[in-house]
Amino acid sequence: MNSAVSEAALIGIDWGTSSLRAFLIGPDGEVLEAVSSTRGIMSVEDGNFDAVFHDLIRPWISQKTLPIIASGMITSRNGWVETPYVQVPSGVSDLAAALVSFETSSGINVRFVTGMTTDHNGAPDIMRGEETQIIGATAAGLGDGTYVLPGTHSKWILVENNRIVDYSTYMTGEIYGALRSHTILRTLMEEGSFNEEGFRRGVTSGLAAGINLLHELFHVRTLPLFGKISGDMVADYLSGMLIGVELKAASEAFGKDSAITIIGRGDLADRYELGLELAGLSCRKAPENIVARGHFLIAKSAGILS
């Protein structure tokens, strides 16, 4: 048995739309090992989640029986086991009480974290996976305040007394993909490395756009047409504009008084950090793998760990 497995207390699984991560978690919530895959729920053929699950963590479960907690879109209608939603405000104890147990083909018991839901003027909002990351952030000492989780559907989440009290979803990433690939703007997009000047100009435009967004979007076509921006700036100008609109709306809804915590990885988190700075808002980045801390805290609250 390898030393990491012998020390482990828990396996945490973060299974989203486009990616899959698993963590071997120690007795104090530390990540001992991690593995990842591109087998998000939308790339699993014929709903064969059981096989993907076993393939990913077989080196661990073949050596030791460990409790397993899974979160993310794997609990959605398109996932492995659909779980209900808990209503905000909610915290770690609510999620722990609502865990859904499921037995795999090999007899392993997996506990799935439920999603969360809220209501804005009669329209529901939902999330799956982000709640576990927020629990991990509070365990990491990041505490109360506003969090942004960039992605295809960005989440802005308000935390008070270590409980999620409100949140909103913004379809920024998906709108960007649709505009870039399925509108007249697609003919202007050039592949290349990140163009910071184009992004900065786009954010500035987005922050000022307000209700004029549909008009401002046409400038993504006309600015390069008249040589106001170069071709290699267009994609990042569009990205910046949409992120700027999101930052303006969300910061007004959730407040600007304290530092906004960014939970995310790589280029997209960097873009939001730059965008927030351009908007005059203070921000900080959460440490990596905080979702594993969330798995650990939920498991502990549920009495799964001693």
Region locations from a protein language model:
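Short glycine-aspartate micro-motif
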Residues: 10-14, 67-69, 145-149, 261-262
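Short glycine-rich, Thr/Ser-proximal phosphate-binding strand/loop in the N-terminal lobe
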Residues: 10-48
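A short acidic Gly-Thr/Ser loop motif
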Residues: 13-19, 73, 149-153, 172, ...
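Glycine-rich phosphate-binding loops at beta-strand->alpha-helix junctions
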Residues: 19, 257-275
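Glycine-rich phosphate-binding loop plus the immediately following alpha-helix
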Residues: 44-45, 116-206
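Short beta-strand-loop/turn "lid" adjacent to the catalytic site in phosphate-handling enzymes
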Residues: 60-127, 161
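Adenine-nucleotide phosphate-binding core of ATP-dependent small-molecule kinases
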Residues: 206-247
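Glycine-rich phosphate-binding/hydrolytic loop that grips phosphoryl groups
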Residues: 281-306
